[in-house]
């Protein structure tokens, strides 16, 4: 549907063929590497280091982001506590459940207090209990920053999103009326989905 391409454009991994992506009125291409300070990314693939402990992984990611150790020492315990990983911080990542790994990926995205969080299929492969937990975490972050997440799971969007965009064949669908009806609780998001896609696949 073009979801991965759109996410790569927003994160700066791809450059648009035409048009521009703006942050506070500035082209992200002109912002250069400083743009990366504004974003935290939770990728779809859980590419973690199985022999690292959770805590070591966060310190490693903090170093890659250019954070000094003093600041990392302040942030990492807070993040581990927020994501309910303090008791597991010294366990090897290979011992983590899928939900714990996802929380750890969210933790690295939170390092250095980004103003934009980007999630790509954040609940893929999780059991229902883990999915609800991750969804609740994402909802909590939206109070003080921009949260963008791409998913095929309608229930995740229904519970966690305040704005919805539909992608089909790489194009954004003109769905302002339908999404406004959803926000006004005149219809469900599932009904909006069926209106546009029927039995086809989609990205949100």
Predicted segments with their positions:
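Conserved ABC ATPase "signature" region
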Residues: 59, 63, 70-88
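Conserved beta-strand-loop-alpha-helix hinge in the C-terminal portion
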Residues: 171-194
